[in-house]
Amino acid sequence: MKHDKEGAGYRHQRLEVSIAEELRSLLRDDVSDPDLDRVGVTAVALSSDYKNAKVHFVIARGRSRAAVERALERATAFLRRRLADSIELKRTPDLRFVFEAEIDMGPTE
């Protein structure tokens, strides 16, 4: 069977979007750590072998970047387990969080 590079690229891109959406949902609805309030996932860059994912994130202006990064580190195993339950992959990628920026976010709900 011929390997369809265009189809593989589409699948890769679709998985990046799916992982980003799932992480947004998990951070918003399932993670109870107050240090992760008002953290937004902006993009996911999945390695070509699907083993690693760089998760780009932003935080609300005034939040402690160091506290958020420590909280993300603590939550990584939980997030990977939940991703494994919701996204079909042979292996759930290792997550590496990459800070992008502090931004102004609207009031909390």
Regions found by a protein language model. Give the residues of each.
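Charge-rich, low-complexity N-terminal segments
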Residues: 1-52, 58-109
